């Protein structure tokens, strides 16, 4: 079971596909008693749930859910499955498999709208009778490439499995969608085609262009479009189904080698032609008739000469005419679009509609009988004229052919008379033939279009056959349909139950053959075998005098009483008569055979067919090419060969031929079955009738299919394939390097894997698996591959890291070497010998260079020679290379040619294999036909012999009759005499005879009644004997099953006792859990109190950070001052140093002079003493000065070091604070930028709105002025009209004189009248368009109300989910406490709890992703809404401009009218025309005035709508601003949660696999308890090993730290020894002191970092600071004496460098140890801080999430409002589009007017000179104006079309956005649940972090203690050094004094 987060990819379809996690947990926790929970038989509901009260003596007393107590037999009680099996997706997984379990599982899933359920190897679907969102694009994407067990049941899953099997197994596939009529087969077929067209798209447009020049759609578009076209002409409403397929179709979708769509074709079977002319009351004819009459396309109504009322046409109005679930108008547009996409030419399209209209007219043709004759004659020709016109026929010829057809008698044609009924029959037959042939021709054209000529390899066939039908009136069509379903059910049974078990036997698997009793051969043989129903029907069709009665008698004679499936129906009141009954698998059907012989022969009027063949309509002539009275037709538009003679082929024979082809196709494919179920007969959504569903389940073999799936081995794989794929699970099981058989390898591999070894079997060539095991192996393989890849990555990364480390080591050694050499050079560079060496070495080099030059010359000559040789060789090699390249190219060409030939050969081979398969199939068909023919021939010969015997007997009877006739003649004469005597006696006997005849009749009736009763009793005896045999068999079976039940009952009793013990343990554990829950609640309160304290601490820390920032600034200023003082001190020190060097130089000169004057006098000695005393004095002064300088420098240095250390530490802290603040600053900047952008967009929108308002106000004022102008114009026109009327009297006197001119100008008048009529018609069209738009507005508002109701339902569902979520959280807490308390006793339960918590962490992560997705979607929504608002405003401006243009055009029209009136006044020649024109113009003006008033009303409505829009836009802008704020808050949450995500990712990945394993283990815990315990023990051992490993790791870490400390101690001891050895080395001590100073500063920084947590170390730090001050004082003393020992320092520097290197190594190790301590400490603090931060963030997030959810709800409501507004705008745009179309028509009319005017101008030039010139000028000006208007209208039309497309796109986006908002609300709700789970996990992490911090703190204290000991040892060493210094000074003074 996948989690809710994994189901998120299905979008809004998820709740309709799989139970939520909450429901699954509730089902597992639901109380359930396996002993008492049962189903019991109920007379009304079939089965009901009940609880057992008692069991006594084979009787069970139970209490039903309704509260009723019932007592039933043991065999009427069925155990109930545990709650975890509620709504299970695969019913084969049920513990108890029986009818009530299957029924209730389907019912509960159906109630939750999960309509798809697996039933073993096939899928069951229940018709929902409503639209469900489970077929959209995201669901298609989610199912793509998914295994069956990875996704919920769905028709897409079946389709994808078929597609994957085709690609992997390289075998053709078929999907058989079966079920009764109305079960949903057609819808599922459409979804299958939609799926294949989506996943296997080619994306290429077809290259062909039709005659209209339009490019066709892609192949996938055409495949999808074929469906609506075929549905329009082949689907109709029936009693059980509003969209029932009245024909069968087998759609083959062909794929190429890469799995892409290659082509497709469709085969159709048995279109129900009779529906064209006849329908039952509750049914209707084919959809296309009602689509045409829906008036969606008025041009069709005009073209077909029909009305929009179906009741005007007899053929289509015998039943219902409307269907509530079908919109005929929308369906007409879809049909018309499909015709265009599928490449029908315009002529073909028109022909299709015309022929459909002609069929409707055929039904209205009337005929009557001639007086005193039986001959028929037409009763009116109007309808016939229409039908003939539509078919391009002569009406008279058509009527003559119908009433007087020509019949061929011998070699001559004779005219035959027809009665009225015969004519009506002929008309109906022709209508059916035309419709049927047109349908088959359309299928042929579709196949031609779908055949792309691309290479194709395999196909997937989808079968959609009309479902099983049981009507009140069942005819030949129903028999064919039901027979087809019988054959398909038999194919299913054979495939599922027979072939499957034969495969087991063939593979050598131990298997006991199971007979499921699903053989339907008896019924099939009754219909199709020789002397069956079809055979007798075809035989009767051969005899010319055969009737329905003779056919019925033959059926009774042949089958009644001989076949159990053939029965005589019982008469029922109120139902049509039935002649025989057949027992089908789905029920007993009563058939009426009236008219079967005519239907089967399907005769046509050959004379009318001849007219059709000669029709000018190409399509009609093509339909009847080569047709005769009875046609040979092939299904699917393919003409098949004739079977029965050359004259005709019957309908039943053709049907059987096509059915056999279909079954052959299906047998050559791998089938996939989908069983469709009708839930109820009333088409009510959500309701299920138990008895109806059970009947279908029994008939469809659902239970048997589940049993064979459970008992058998549905999954199988070849040994080699298994070894190749699953070797990775345990590679060591199959030894490398040696040959091993694939079977043995598979056996070893499976034996080494930890799975149930009873779940698979080994066959001869394959290994067989039970259901579900192969999926488990796939999961294990995926886990293994993930481990191997992870390990490989780790090894690669480790290798790369080691290589990099080796490079670093080498680089370090090189640097040390360079440093050593440079230092050595610096020491010896002033040595005189070295200087001499530097001078001599270049001289030596010059001599060496001369030698080298000579050598180089020799080498140069040698290399020159070698170069010449190599050049020669190179040329030779290049020549060889050229030849080799030529050879290589030749070889490549040969290889390519061979490869091409090989590919051609392979293709030919494949084609030959395919043709071989096809030929084999044909051979089978031919052999089957031959066998049928032989059987029929044998039957006919037997009949012939029988008839010959009867003829001979009849001849004998005739001879006997002739002899008796002669005797009678003789006796006649004798009797004549007797008759005379007896006449008198006859009169007396007449009365007696009358009495006797009455008695005879009564006796005959009684005799007939007794005969009937006898026949019925015999039938009963036969049926009773058969029933007795069956019952005896059932008794035997029941006795065997009773023994099995007893055994099972004993086992169940044992299991019951065991479960009772488990129940007691579970109850005890529940009590413990409740106690632990109370304790945890108390802990939770404490933690919440601690969290509040931590929050206050965080606020204090933030305040401290602000103070530290201020202090940083002050300290920086102080640092700058100290640096200036240091610079001054350095300058003074340099000056003193210079003086000291001068004095030392003078001292040296004086000493040299003293040595030279060694033998000087005493005076000189005294002088020397004086000078020496002066020198000593100066020296002391110098020393005191230097000491003072040193002291001041030391104090400054000390202050500087203190301040630097302190500031450095503060800088580090502040640097971190600064980084954090900079990060926050950047985040705030981003938020500010977003806000600024939002503000800009809002301000822009506001500005646009203001502009729009101003524009609208300006337009309003302009419209008012225009209105006033129009009013003035109207007044002028009325005045002109009055004036013209007064002048009309005067003009009438001149009428006679101008008759000649009137005749010439009448043409102009006619043109103007046409123009006025066109304007009238356009006005009417505008009114119609307006009413249509108003209707669309109403429908959109209704849709809006529906959406609002749906939203409220969603809100209620969401509230319900929240309540369920809180309940689930409480249950999670209970489970958690249970697992924590029972951790030691129940390790397994503890692990499960841990994994569940890990799963919740994963859920939290997925919810985070959902929140991120919602943030992005909300941002997109905001931007899109803003853009749409702007676009809509622009469109409104455009429409206003269009209105203004229309007004301008209106004024132009008014000007034109005024000009023509002026022409009337100027030209007396046009007197009469002007009078009539003025009258017509006045009437037109009145109409225009009315239209103008209507336009004013529309303008007012537009103003109101604009105001509403402005108000809504302002609301939207406010919502957008609020949404922006919410989005920024969500982005903050997103960043915080992303940080948490990175920390939790690793833990989630580790826990994911184990969680699924543990959940599966919980489900099997009752049956696998022992296995689970062993698993637990193993896992405990693994955990112990992990703990031991962790301990070892910690011990190693401690040991490494101890070793580093030991190394540090050793280095300290070495340093002490070095100090003792080098007592005079004061420079060494200075370096050590500097190092100690650095160490002290480092310790100070470490101390201050840990100051908040480790307060107890404060005392140690104070001691360290005091020791630092002492060291600094010692440093000052050392520096004062350093000047005296400078020479000694120079001598000892080399030694110092060696010791320095060893010292640095020790120091580095010490630094590493201290860094480790610091790292541990920082980790500890970071964990604590993280804990605090997360706890505060969680509380904030919870509050913010509630606000966000509320805001999202508001945003959704506003989005809905925006959608309605957009819909209104779209409607307005549609009005404008209609207006533009109207203007386009006006443009065409004006162009026509220009042409007429031009013609009139030519004529007027001949009649008038001056007046003509004026008229020409005016007309030219008029032409120019009209051309300008035409151009402007074209531009406006283009703009209107663009605007329309844009608005349509926006409406779609808004609807999509609404759906996105709903999804986001659901995601947010899930996020709340997951965040609550996350809080608990964080608390647990915080506790672990506290434990870890305590461990780290103890380690730190120990290391700190060791560090203090090391510092004490260093202090001791320094004190010893000081003592040595004192001694050295004393020794030095002694030496000086002695000198």
Curated annotation (Swiss-Prot):
User: Phosphoserine is carried by which residues?
Assistant: 1092, 1096, 1162, 1237, 1243, 1261, 1288, 1292, 1303, 1306, 1474, 1495, 1514, 1542, 1554, 1574, 1600, 1603, 1714, 1726, 1739
Pfam family for this entry, one = Myosin_tail_1
Domain of life where this protein originates: Eukaryota
Q: What is the effect of changing residue 993 to V?
A: Found in autosomal recessive deafness; uncertain significance
Q: Name one GO biological process term.
A: muscle contraction
Q: Which ranges carry the Myosin N-terminal SH3-like domain?
A: 33-82
Xref: PROSITE patterns: IQ (PS50096), MYOSIN_MOTOR (PS51456), SH3_LIKE (PS51844)
Q: What is the effect of changing residue 813 to V?
A: Found in autosomal recessive deafness; uncertain significance
Matching InterPro entries, A to Z?
IQ_motif_EF-hand-BS, Kinesin_motor_dom_sf, Myosin_head_motor_dom-like, Myosin_N, Myosin_S1_N, Myosin_tail, P-loop_NTPase, XRCC4-like_C
> Which CDD domains does the entry mention?
MYSc_Myh1_mammals
Instruction: Identify the keywords attached in UniProt to this record, alphabetized.
Output: Actin-binding, ATP-binding, Calmodulin-binding, Coiled coil, Cytoplasm, Hearing, Methylation, Motor protein, Muscle protein, Myosin, Nucleotide-binding, Phosphoprotein, Thick filament
List residues of the Myosin motor domain: 86-782
Q: Locate the Phosphothreonine modifications and list their residues.
A: 64, 69, 419, 1241, 1265, 1286, 1467, 1501, 1517, 1730, 1736
User: What residue stretch is flagged as signal peptide?
Assistant: none
Give all N6,N6,N6-trimethyllysine modified positions: 130
The record's subcellular location field reads: Cytoplasm, Myofibril
Consequence of substituting residue 194 to H: Found in autosomal recessive deafness; uncertain significance
The free-text function statement in the UniProt record for this protein reads: Required for normal hearing. It plays a role in cochlear amplification of auditory stimuli, likely through the positive regulation of prestin (SLC26A5) activity and outer hair cell (OHC) electromotility.
Tell me, how does this one assemble? Muscle myosin is a hexameric protein that consists of 2 heavy chain subunits (MHC), 2 alkali light chain subunits (MLC) and 2 regulatory light chain subunits (MLC-2). Interacts with SLC26A5.
Q: Supply the name of the protein.
A: Myosin-1
